Amino acid sequence: MKFSCEKETLLNLLNIASRAVTGKSSMPLLEGLLLAADADTLTITGYDLSMGIRTTAQVDVVEPGRIVLNSRLFCEIVRKLPQDVVYLETDDKLMTTIKCGRSVFNLMASEADEYPALADVASDKGLSLPQPILKSMIAQTIFSVSDNESKPIHTGCQFEIEGSRLNVVAVDGYRLSVRRETVEGVPGDMKFVVPGASLREIERILGDDDDIVEIFPDSKNILFRIGGTTLITRLIDGEFLNYRAAIPKEFEHEVSADRQELIQCIERVSLIVSEKLKNPIRFHFDGSYVQMSCVTAIGKSYDECPFDGSIENLEIGFNNRYILEALRAAGDEQVKLQLKGALNPMIISPMEGDKYTYLVLPVRLKAND
């Protein structure tokens, strides 16, 4: 194999494909990246048997071929190379020479024939939508994905297609996030759960322009095609929470608040909260203000924030991080807050429509909180 390309072209491919490479594996080949040069195209693949990423770019190919190079070392070498054209050549004994400027490296490659093939996705039912929309749907829900492996189904986001509606849902037992979007050309109703780790990689790959991302799920795997990059990952089996039943239908109180002002107040009160001192924040709604306070072993904090509407003497506790993550994800200038009582969840939603819904369960307050 022999090809050349600009350093940035090669580095971009490596930065994407290497995200699917495991650090340690009983199969040494899985610690490597598969490089395949053919015609005027270089394809680099990373795979950990659960998620695979294959990404392609045009390069100057002199001799086609396929090899596997250790991902960590190869990526580190390319990052340190000068900004110039990179020349890569492999001889018949798999000795690979990498040249760039005055830098020269010789690495022993592995045979590519034993590198496992990415999972096949047997589906002709695809969904297409602009990359920024999928990116925002992931960003506005992924923080609610559970990290508790005892219930694997909730370590991913549920994608639910009903009619022309796409809903992305995440839940971790303490909060629930739903992001809704109207899409065109949907293949029919379906549900599937995509691992949170895979969605975080997809979010990194997605661009901010209006290019299309194509999504093809089957019964076991799902394929995301994003320009010259393809990501394939296993789906998670199991029974996802009936999230509609979890969202209250009736509330005693409904007010609105300036989202940024609310965030800033909570951030200030949270300054005395840490990983070791995780006391909840006490929210005291009284009149048209919410008074926030917190007590930990290192001190006390207090602030207050106005809102539109009126609530008489409601006191409720929340985990500061859960509330902040929901408010930051919302994005709107004004948000609607709906509450029922001190032991009921709070709902954060837009002033109009139902583009997103965030449910946060309260924390039972103690006298010294």
Task: Identify the residue ranges that each predicted region occupies.
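Structural preference for solvent-exposed beta-strand-turn elements
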Residues: 1-369
